[in-house]
Amino acid sequence: MTTIRQLASAQRTRRARALIVAGAALALGHPCGTLAAGDAMRGKSLYESRCIACHSIDANRIGPAHKGVYGRKAGSAAGYDYSPAVKASAVVWGDATLDRWLANPESVIPGQKMGYSVPEAADRADLIAYLKSQSGK
């Protein structure tokens, strides 16, 4: 039976390994903030379980359609009633902007309407890979 001490020790070991990897990446000049490559198939599954209540790839719903979102200026898809903040934004959807948006939409475009976030970096990377695949990228 696993004890609390064993679990805590395992967690410390994982954290230590993560710090070692991050330190090595910095020493080699690799930015730690670089997004990991996502899994588009897992992203599709996540999209269908988390995003589909408000979004669709092909049609506007509560939120805008996502077909072609990657590489597009925020607030520019036809037929959707974006908030004034999103319409006025200069944001173009790419890896970094989508990652920040999914983590905390309000921090990217204050005054936007989306009230949902994706806290896990791996989930965001997978969703971005899926959205990218649906944009011909």
Q: PLM features: residue spans?
A:
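Solvent-exposed, acidic/flexible segments
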Residues: A40, K44, A59, V91, ...
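Cleavable N-terminal signal peptides
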Residues: G23-A24, T34-L35
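Sequence/structural segment immediately N-terminal to covalent heme-attachment motifs in c-type
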Residues: G38-R61, H66
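Bacterial N-terminal signal peptides that target proteins for export
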Residues: T3-I20
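C-terminal capping alpha-helices of c-type cytochrome domains
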Residues: G94-K137
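N-terminal signal peptide c-region/cleavage motif recognized by signal peptidases
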Residues: G29-C32
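Short Fe-S-cluster ligation motifs
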Residues: G79-D99
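Short glycine/threonine-rich turn/loop motifs
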Residues: A40, P64-P84
